[in-house]
Amino acid sequence: NDELKEFYALFDKTFLGLFPSFIDEMNALLDAEACTEGRRDGELTTVLRIYALIRLGIADTATIAALLHCSIRTVYNYRSFVQRHVRPEVGDLEQRVQLIGINGNSDHSTQNPAI
C-alpha cells in the first residue's frame, strides 16, 4: 500500500501547490462543526481530497471513489455530512468549491471565525 500512500502524498502536495488557500477557503464555506484542517506535513484528509477533486471538475461519486480507492458509500457519506454543514449564505457548495483559488472570487465575508 506504499504506492497508494505515495499517490496521496503527491496529489496533496501538487493540489495544495496549485490551490494553497484551499483548506481555509473550504472551511469558510462550512460551519464550525465541519471545519477541517489538513493532516501533518500538508496532507489532506479524505473529505478535503473529495472536495479537491470536485474543485478539479471531478464530481461523479463513483469516479471520486475509484480515484481515492474507497467505497462509493464512503464518498456519499462524507459529501452528505459536509452538505449538512454548509453555511446558509453559501448557497450551492459545489459551485462555490469550483471558484476556490480564482482571484477575486473568494468571499472572505463568509469566513468562519473559528478558523
State where each predicted segment sits.
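Cytosolic nucleotide-binding catalytic cores of signal-transduction proteins
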Residues: K5, A9-I115
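Short, charged/polar, low-complexity loop and linker segments
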Residues: N1-D2
